[in-house]
């Protein structure tokens, strides 16, 4: 990544050579110029076997090569980060699993994600695991996904636009859906749902964690992402 920081220097050298290269003499090993981006003097190394234009072309080629390298590294870094985040969410699902059928669904997710091969001839298993279901003190149903597949189904197939969605901020955890039935959600239910989102996340052992909450219609699926990964916009 350090080498990619040189790319702008090479681009500027190429531009300056195209601007001031007329003053370079055959056989010169450097060219003194003023960087018109910051007004500072700059010494540009030259290959004495090349013309100023050829030296400029060489620097632009170096710039473009480093730019491509940086773009590739940025994409790879994001891909690795996404994989780590996904595996952390799977680890969280294992932590909150309570029965064998919960583990079966986690295994199915790992097969669908390509981490585990399905045994030859074996069919997709029937999933019997269901989300946790709680009733708030105000009588509202609160559902908690046990894994990414359940999170995906809860948010995008079960919940409707005016239901409320809760999730621990910036960390792997369960999607919590509160069914409103078109009613106003009381403060106590907001707090209870937020506690569920905190408890069923990787931050459950921390003294205090933030929880985001929005109406389900504000939650969007990320194209091409693993199941359960979303984007959303809060209004607070």
What are these regions (language model features)?
Residues 1-236:
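Extended, highly charged segments
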């Amino acid at each position: 990544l350090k080498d990619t920081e040189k790319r702008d220097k090479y681009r500027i050298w190429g531009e300056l050579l195209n601007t001031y290269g007329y003053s370079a003499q055959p056989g010169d090993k450097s060219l003194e110029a003023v960087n018109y981006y910051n007004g500072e003097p700059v010494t540009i190394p030259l290959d004495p076997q090349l013309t100023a234009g050829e030296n400029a072309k060489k620097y632009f080629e170096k710039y473009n090569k480093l730019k491509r390298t940086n773009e590739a590294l940025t994409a790879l870094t994001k891909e690795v980060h996404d994989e780590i985040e996904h595996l952390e969410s799977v680890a969280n699902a294992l932590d909150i699993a309570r029965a064998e059928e919960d583990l079966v669904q986690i295994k199915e997710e790992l097969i669908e994600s390509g981490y585990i091969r399905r045994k030859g001839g074996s069919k997709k298993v029937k999933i019997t695991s269901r989300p946790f279901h709680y009733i708030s003190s105000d009588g509202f149903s609160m559902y908690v996904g046990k894994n990414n597949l359940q999170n995906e189904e809860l948010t995008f197939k079960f919940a409707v636009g005016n239901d409320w969605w809760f999730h621990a901020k910036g960390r792997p955890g369960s999607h919590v859906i509160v069914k409103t039935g078109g009613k106003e959600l009381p403060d106590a239910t907001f707090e209870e749902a937020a506690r569920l989102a905190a408890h069923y996340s990787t931050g459950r052992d921390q003294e205090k964690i933030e929880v985001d909450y929005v109406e389900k219609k504000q939650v969007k699926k990320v194209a091409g992402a693993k199941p359960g990964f979303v984007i959303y916009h809060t209004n607070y």
